[in-house]
From Swiss-Prot:
This is DNA dC->dU-editing enzyme APOBEC3. The active site is at E73 (proton donor). It catalyses: a 2'-deoxycytidine in single-stranded DNA + H2O + H(+) = a 2'-deoxyuridine in single-stranded DNA + NH4(+). Its cofactor is Zn(2+). Belongs to the cytidine and deoxycytidylate deaminase family. The keyword Translocase does not apply. PROSITE patterns: CYT_DCMP_DEAMINASES_1, CYT_DCMP_DEAMINASES_2. The gene is Apobec3. Residues 38-154, 238-357 form the CMP/dCMP-type deaminase domain.
Length: 429
C-alpha cells in the first residue's frame, strides 16, 4: 500500500483527553517495568512546535489515550491533521515529540510511516516508557522503518520522565521522584531497543568500519542523555560535506533544516604509522560529537600525537570544558581544532568555553580554503578536486575576525599567539 494522508481518509475528529493527567495515572501507566501485562491502556503525551532557526515555537501540547479501539497514535494523527495541518501553512515545518507509555504496535507504526511519507514538513521524536511486544518480528521491523523514515525512537530516560512530569502531570508543584529501579529498567528497555534498531542504522562504505557502543556521562548539559549510541564512519558523501560544512551565516542554517554537528579527526603519531581518521556525528538530543571523540581517543591510550579536528560548529561550553580538561591531563598531545562556524558566539558562556580551550593549549581556528580542501581530500573524495562555493573565503575571513575579537575581549590574544608559535612535531632529540 502506498503513502496516503490518514487525516483525509477519516472524517471523525478526536480530541485530547486533557492537558494534564493525575500523578497516580502517570506513575501507574508510565512506570517502565520489564513486564507490565496489566497495563493495557496507552497514553501519549505530545508537544508540537513550529520549527524556527532561532528557537522552536511551542504550538500545542496535551495527552491522548486509546479510544473506541483506536490507538492513541492514530487519534493524534487525526487531530493533528484537522487542527494543525488544515489551519497553518503547508510550508510550515513542525517538530512533534511523543512521550508514550507503550511503543507503537506494528499497525500504528505502519500508519505513522505512511503519514510521515505524505507530510515531508514533519519530524517526529518518539520516547516510550516500555516496548510493546518486542519479540514480534513485525513490531521490530516497523520500529526500524520508523527510524529509516527519519523518526527518532528512544526509550524514556530520567530526563524524559522529569520533563513529562513537569509538563503533562498535575504535579501540584512537586518534583518528580524516580521510582525504584527506574534507571535499571531504562537500561533494559534501551538495550532491547538498540538490539532491534541496530540492523536499520545507515550503512557506511565497505572500506570503513562502524562501531556501536554505549557511553555513560557523569555530568553535562540538561539535555544530555545518560546512555547513548555512537556511530563512527570514515567518509562523508559529497552532498553531506557541501550541506554540513557550508560556512554561511547562522540565520540561514538551523538544525531543523538538516544542519548537523559533524567532527572529522585525523591522528598523526610520531612513530611513523599511517594517520588514523574518522568522522563522528551528533544526533539531536543525544551525545555531542566532541564527547564521542574524547571517548574514542581515551580508549586508544595515546601520548605523543598530533590531532587535527574539523568541526561544522564550534564546541558548546560543556564540550569545550571537557576538551580542555582532557588536554590539560595530556600536555604532550597537540590538538588543533578548525571550525566552519561559531556556535552562539555572542553568548558569554560559549565565549568562555572557547577561552578554556585556548587556556588549555588547544589551538582553535576558523576553517579557510586550505582547511576545507584538506577536509575534502581526507574525508570525502581524494580523487576529485574540491570546488569552493561562492563567498567561502569572504565568510571565513569574517568568522576569523569574529573569533579574533573574542580572543581580544577576554585578553587572550598574546596567549594564543604563543601557542601558535609552538613547534608542531616530535620533540628534538
Amino acid at each position: 500500500m502506498g503513502p496516503f494522508c490518514l487525516g483525509c481518509s477519516h472524517r471523525k475528529c478526536y480530541s485530547p483527553i486533557r492537558n494534564l493527567i493525575s500523578q497516580e495515572t502517570f506513575k501507574f501507566h508510565f512506570k517502565n517495568l520489564r513486564y507490565a501485562i496489566d497495563r493495557k491502556d496507552t497514553f501519549l503525551c505530545y508537544e508540537v512546535t513550529r520549527k524556527d532557526c532561532d528557537s522552536p515555537v511551542s504550538l500545542h501540547h496535551g495527552v491522548f489515550k486509546n479510544k473506541d479501539n483506536i490507538h492513541a497514535e492514530i487519534c493524534f494523527l487525526y487531530w493533528f491533521h484537522d487542527k494543525v495541518l488544515k489551519v497553518l501553512s503547508p510550508r510550515e515545518e513542525f517538530k512533534i515529540t511523543w512521550y508514550m507509555s507503550w511503543s507503537p504496535c506494528f499497525e500504528c507504526a505502519e500508519q505513522v510511516l505512511r503519514f510521515l511519507a505524505t507530510h515531508h514538513n514533519l519530524s517526529l521524536d518518539i520516547f516510550s516508557s516500555r516496548l510493546y511486544n518486542i519479540r514480534d518480528p513485525e513490531n521490530q521491523q516497523n520500529l526500524c522503518r520508523l527510524v529509516q523514515e527519519g523518526a527518532q525512537v528512544a526509550a524514556m530516560d530520567l530526563y524524559e520522565f522529569k520533563k513529562c512530569w513537569k509538563k503533562f502531570v498535575d504535579n501540584g508543584g512537586r518534583r518528580f521522584r524516580p521510582w525504584k529501579k527506574l534507571l535499571t529498567n531504562f537500561r533494559y528497555q534501551d538495550s532491547k531497543l538498540q538490539e532491534i534498531l541496530r540492523p536499520c542504522y545507515i550503512p557506511v562504505p565497505s572500506s570503513s568500519s562502524s562501531t556501536l557502543s554505549n557511553i555513560c556521562l557523569t555530568k553535562g548539559l540538561p539535555e544530555t542523555r545518560f546512555c547513548v549510541e555512537r556511530r563512527r564512519v570514515h567518509l562523508l558523501s559529497e552532498e553531506e560535506f557541501y550541506s554540513q560544512f557550508y560556512n554561511q551565516r547562522v540565520k540561514h542554517l538551523c538544525y531543523y533544516h538538516g544542519v548537523k554537528p559533524y567532527l572529522c579527526y585525523q591522528l598523526e603519531q610520531f612513530n611513523g604509522q599511517a594517520p588514523l581518521k574518522g568522522c563522528l556525528l551528533s544526533e539531536k538530543g543525544k551525545q555531542h560529537a566532541e564527547i564521542l571523540f574524547l571517548d574514542k581517543i581515551r580508549s586508544m591510550e595515546l601520548s605523543q600525537v598530533i590531532i587535527t579536528c574539523y568541526l561544522t560548529w564550534s564546541p558548546c561550553p560543556n564540550c569545550a570544558w571537557q576538551l580542555a580538561a582532557f588536554k590539560r591531563d595530556r600536555p604532550d598531545l597537540i590538538l588543533h581544532i578548525y571550525t566552519s562556524r561559531l556556535y552562539f558566539h555572542w553568548k558569554r558562556p560559549f565565549q568562555k568555553g572557547l577561552c578554556s580551550l585556548w587556556q588549555s593549549g588547544i589551538l582553535v581556528d576558523v576553517m579557510d580554503l586550505p582547511q576545507f580542501t584538506d577536509c575534502w581530500t581526507n574525508f570525502v573524495n581524494p580523487k576529485r578536486p574540491f570546488w569552493p562555493w561562492k563567498g567561502l573565503e569572504i565568510i571565513s575571513r569574517r568568522t576569523q575576525r569574529r573569533l579574533h575579537r573574542i580572543k581580544e575581549s577576554w585578553g587572550l590574544q598574546d596567549l594564543v599567539n604563543d601557542f601558535g608559535n609552538l613547534q608542531l612535531g616530535p620533540p628534538m632529540s
